[in-house]
A protein has these predicted regions:
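N-terminal regions immediately upstream of nucleotidyltransferase
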Residues: 1-77, 89-96, 121-124
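Glycine-rich, often proline-containing surface loops adjacent to acidic residues and nearby aromatics
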Residues: 16, 76-85, 192-203, 221, ...
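Conserved catalytic core of two-metal-ion nucleotidyltransferases
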Residues: 44-48, 66, 98-156
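Short N-terminal edge-element motif at the start of the domain
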Residues: 50-52, 57, 95-103, 200-209, ...
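Extended, alpha-helix-rich binding/interface surfaces that flank or overlap catalytic cores
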Residues: 70, 135-207
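Extracellular/secreted glycoprotein ectodomains characterized by long, lumenal stretches
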Residues: 72-74, 85-90, 102, 142
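Short beta-strand-to-loop capping motifs
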Residues: 84-88, 249-252
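Conserved nucleotidyltransferase catalytic core and NTase-mimicking acidic/glycine-rich helix/loop elements
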Residues: 204-281
Length: 281
């Protein structure tokens, strides 16, 4: 069945607006994520924490940072990704950094049963449909700026193989700033967080004030959830969808505040490429 997107179709416009509204987290879900983040950040950084001497800088990254989180689909969960950066050099072994933050979380009777080891983060699995991922990190002195190094652990934490463990360079703050620059502003939003110990999760944007690009990313992510529901391991990660969307916006000759117009331009091009190269799965 051919799928044709017509940007002038007012019915499609209205339908996509309705979908966008329904993709937003509920107020309860949003406040729940913020509350859990604040509690974990406080536990990691407060007075008496063994991490305190390393000046922990805790900040959100990913979808919650840029406002593109979507309501869970089917049995999926929504999450909040965070970074806990310590003032250490890369002479510290990746596994040692991971262990330091793991041990601090393990000290909490609340977090201990919720902890799950992931290759580049520690996951806290809450009851219901939410989990919080905490990525240990240090400053990436080679690349500078906001770049950080995160552990990439290929072995079980209890059986570390140092020769297989390494650092991965990433820049979640830079990625978020770049994405915000691609957004067509509904209003000027250029707030910069001070270098505080714990950065708050950015305030939730009302749907009518959310830039078109952010709504497009949410729609694309829901398309991904539906399209790959029976093959989740093949689903493109959110960072890829976000980057492709941002690049599409950056090459547009005319900015648009219309979600359907922007989305149609982006998806039409991708679907045409997909028909030729099957690059969308």
């Amino acid at each position: 069945m051919a799928f044709n997107i017509d940007a002038s179709n007012h019915t499609l416009d209205a339908l996509l607006e309705i979908v966008c509204v329904n993709l937003q987290l509920t107020e309860t879900q949003d406040q729940r994520a913020r509350g859990h983040y604040a509690s974990v950040a406080n536990w990691l950084s407060r007075e008496g924490s063994p991490l305190r001497e390393f000046s922990p800088h805790i900040f959100p990254q990913g979808s919650q940072r840029i406002g593109t989180t979507t309501k869970p689909f089917g049995r999926s969960e929504f999450d909040l990704d965070a970074v806990c950066k310590l003032m250490l050099t890369d002479e510290c072994h990746p596994g040692e950094l991971y262990q330091m933050i793991w041990d601090r979380l393990f000290e909490s009777a609340t977090y201990r049963p919720m902890m799950k080891q992931m290759p580049r983060c520690i996951r806290l699995e809450y009851s219901g449909d939410f989990h919080l991922d905490i990525a240990p990190a240090i400053l990436d002195e080679e690349h500078g700026g906001n770049c950080i190094l995160v552990p990439d652990l290929n072995a079980n934490l209890a059986l570390l193989h140092p020769e297989n463990d390494c650092w991965k360079s990433t820049n979640p703050i830079g990625q978020a700033d770049w994405f915000e620059d691609q957004c067509v502003p509904v209003f000027v939003l250029n707030e910069k967080y001070a270098r505080a110990q714990v950065d708050p999760v950015p305030e939730k944007e009302a749907i009518h004030a959310k830039p078109a690009l952010k709504r497009c990313v949410q729609l694309y992510k829901r398309w991904r959830d539906v399209e790959y529901a029976d093959r989740p391991k093949l689903a493109p990660p959110s960072i890829i969808l976000t980057t492709l969307s941002g690049r599409s916006a950056g090459t547009s000759t005319k900015a648009s505040n219309s979600v359907p117009t922007h989305l149609s331009q982006f998806l039409t091009g991708r679907f045409r490429r997909s028909n030729r190269t099957n690059d969308l799965g």
